[in-house]
Amino acid sequence: MKIFWPMKKLIVVLWVCSFATAFAQNHAINQQKLANIRQAEQSVVVLNNSGGYLPVKNMEGLKVANVHAGFDFAPVFDSIANKYSTVTSFNTDGITGTEAFNALHDKLKLYNLIVFTISGHTRFTPAFLAFVNDVAALHQVVFVLAGDGKNLTRLDKIQAPAIYYPNNTSEGASIAAQVIFGGVGATAKLAAGYSPGFKQGSGYTTTKIRLGYSVPEAVAVNSDRLAGIDSLIKAGIAAHAAPSVVVLLAKDGQVIFQKAYGKHTYDGTEVTQPDDIFDMASVTKVTATTPAIMRLYDQKAINIDSPISKYIALVRDAPDKRDVKIKEALLHEAGFTPYIKFYEQLKPTDMSRDSSAAYPTKVADGYYLRANYFNEVMWPVTLKSEGHTRGKFVYSDISMYMMKEVVEEVTHTKLNDFVNAEFYRPLGLQATGFLPRNRFDKIRIVPTTENDNWFRNMLVQGYVNDPGSAMAGGVEGHAGLFANANDLAIFYQMLLNQGVYGGKTYFNPGTVKTFTSRQSKVSHRGYGYDRRADKREPGDYCSEQAFGHSGYTGTYVWVDPQYNLVYIFLSNKTYPDDGKTFGVSKINLRPKVLDMYYKAIVDGRAVVEKK
């Protein structure tokens, strides 16, 4: 989020305080906050929405600017809006003359949604009113007005959606931002009339189409029951299970807990933030590669009962692989070897410290691999690799190397480009994707190892930790994806919704059920997705419907349709020494946090039933 404020430092402090309050772990405080939230939800009115623009449907290519004009809770509004789209904020405080407003107008030229936030005490000077009219004539505009409704009369002749709520509170600002993007639906009508365009009883009904953001009490979860998560994770960090952790909990379509712990490194100064970006490791399998296969299955572009060799010609020359079906690979029953140490094939001439046409593949800072290394070395080694007994469950990264090749052969598109176009951009995901250093400053990306002992022998930050994926250029079917917790919550809420999110259908419900249900006769697995194996993984309380996956770097995503929940756990357990640090796994930190989440839900249900 970019902020253009006269008092930027103060605003940032206020934003942090507002965020902390929104997710307070105190039942008494949150009960009062919930009462305020409910009041705001019941009073927010959507006006001038005959065209149905609200809630915003199309997130792809959306560039949002918030223009705050005397708005009292701008930091709260911005923090929530940024959950849905990257937002740049401007403030009109101190701007008075026409020339200054014209300069601000010029700064808005690259944005295609301008949100004006206005309070009842905002002064509509002639220069400001002219500015508002000029912007509304050239851009899609949404007005948000809090407090006294008299300023609605100033907007009477502007045909643009408006959101009004009478109580000028932080909760109202949060709800207004969520109404814009569909995290909350609106049903209220104006209690009084203000002008011919805003008559008493005016108001449009809008629907909830995306995740909302609230307190645990909003879904009958007692915040006090979640307080132990802090203790668990802080103890884990102290035991060097991982230096950096982010946990997100969502239930009933509401994110009710999102918190960051620790620092990027044990001895560093970079404090972990809730929106930090982590290496997904094997969570790539179920957030990129398997969904790509699901899309092709939906479109009948592939048949999972067909052999892989139908789609990949070179597999026809591999006797032990030519008859393997796609579904066998997805179930890890193809007989493939678990993994291949490709780095053991490296020769000094394969690597360079400088980039060139001969060495284009960047695997770390100052480390490049020669051109065509995957096609000339890695892929032939994969095809010739010895296997295991077909039909037996052997978890294998090679399965997803194969699935990536299937996707690219059928779509004629690179896997990273395909999932960006089909899922990540339409969903409004801001951080999810491969090759994050091409898009983000590395300070936003949590490092995975201080000294990669496999082959790079240096800090790995923003480059995929997995050696095979790194050597393949950072885009592979088993690893290479990076994401943050909020993005993952959106993606897995879409799956929990049976393939629907934001008013758009990404999968047929039957496809989601087919891939996430148990499909194996010899294991607990679905097609690509992991499922409950025992009480240790993913925890003691999850239902038989639950599905998800874990990642080697310390990542964890689980969805439980029976409890209507999403659980995201991100960490860098491989830091500082990949291959020797497995604390998160050894102390079962990820399942323990999930168990605490389930207990809080069950306790909440008991209280509701008792009442």
Task: For each feature predicted by the language model, list its residue ranges.
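Bacterial Sec-dependent N-terminal signal peptides
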Residues: 1-27
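Coil residues (strongly favoring Ser/Thr
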Residues: 12-13, 24, 79, 107, ...
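Preference for extracellular/luminal or secreted protein segments
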Residues: 24-222
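Short, gly/Ser/Thr-rich active-site loops of penicillin-recognizing serine hydrolases
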Residues: 27-28, 32-34, 54, 191-199, ...
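Short, conserved catalytic-motif segment at the N-terminal edge
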Residues: 218-280, 301-303, 537, 578-579
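Short active-site loop at a secondary-structure junction
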Residues: 239-246, 268-328, 386-399, 476-479
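Short, surface-exposed loop or secondary-structure junction motifs
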Residues: 319-545
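Short, surface-exposed beta-strand/loop micro-motifs that present aromatic residues
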Residues: 546, 553-568
